[in-house]
Regions:
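Residue-level recognition of single "structural anchor" positions
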Residues: 1-296
Length: 296
């Protein structure tokens, strides 16, 4: 991956549909075309269908956008590429209003484009968290559509979060001592997800989906965690202490998440909370590489 350039430089590199299609072809078939049906290496570019190749052996037609959020979209590839660049490199994200202004498209198109890109930010085959992981739950505010001035239609939604705790000196997993300062540690990767409630079933499902078996879990001592017998459980009783003192890193993540949602989108919508969480996880996990864009 190459360091991101300015939008103008990026647009120069991907100024035409052909350059975007050539990039996608190279990423899909770095060693040359291979038919997904028969494995043959001979194909012809169709004139009747954009960016589509037909296998000369079996006749299977395959587009360079197949399996991506761009497939069967009526938008030019250049718009997809420019929008991806903006959303990947902008420090706080891009709202639909900003994409509308930057790309010269309608608000509806910008909104749909942003939603599809957010859904694609999470790799379904990503590696689970491991080592030492802080886990906790928090409530974040949301608002329904067009309810900015209507508190009746606003509320809070429960989310679960997990964050790796890393030693600053060795970059290895390090369990933080109770009541110890966290200046000698840093946060690693995170995971966030909306959950229905604080029940053992909801919390265990979140942990098993996002944290590797055998990992040390630092928690607030909630009664739902002891059922995770195949994890090392290190409960930190909160008692009268604030949660951010006992579990500093996950509560720092929660605080940043709330501030980001309010600052960038002026509040999160309940209906699309999963896509917003995906985007925040994406940005947090690549916070040291936020100027990295599409490979050149």
């Amino acid at each position: 991956m190459a360091r991101a350039r300015s939008l103008r430089e990026f647009q120069t590199s991907f100024a035409a549909e052909t350059s975007c299609a050539a990039f996608l072809f190279e990423r899909r078939w770095p060693q040359g075309f291979v038919c997904p049906a028969c494995g043959a290496g001979r194909a012809a570019l169709l004139r009747s269908r954009a960016h589509t190749y037909e296998c000369l052996d079996c006749g299977r037609q395959t587009s360079v956008t197949a399996g991506t959020v761009m497939h069967r979209s009526k938008l030019p590839l250049t718009v997809w590429f420019w929008a991806s660049h903006l959303m990947a490199t902008h420090s706080n994200g891009m709202s639909a209003v900003q994409l509308e202004a930057q790309l010269g498209i309608t608000y509806k198109t910008a909104w749909l484009l942003a939603q599809k890109l957010r859904r694609s930010m999470i790799d379904p085959h990503r590696e689970p968290l491991e080592g030492v992981v802080e886990v906790d739950q928090a409530e974040i505010p949301f608002r329904a559509d067009n309810s900015f001035f209507d508190p009746v239609r606003s509320g809070k939604i429960l989310i679960a979060g997990a964050v790796e705790v890393i030693d600053r000196g060795t970059n290895q997993a390090k369990p933080k001592r109770k009541r110890a300062k966290y200046l000698d540690t840093r946060s690693g990767r995170i995971r966030l997800a909306a959950i229905a409630d604080n029940s053992a079933a909801s919390i265990e499902a979140f942990v098993r989906a996002n944290v590797k078996t055998g990992t040390t879990l630092l928690t607030g001592g909630h009664r739902s965690y002891p059922g995770l017998t195949d994890y090392r459980h290190d409960p930190r009783t909160v008692g009268k202490m604030a949660g951010h003192i006992v579990l500093p890193w996950i509560h720092r993540v929660f605080a940043l998440m709330k501030r980001w949602g309010l600052g960038t989108y002026h509040g999160l919508r309940r209906k699309h909370i999963d896509t917003y969480l995906n985007e925040f996880v994406f940005r947090y996990n690549r916070r040291f590489y936020r100027h990295v864009s599409i490979s050149q």
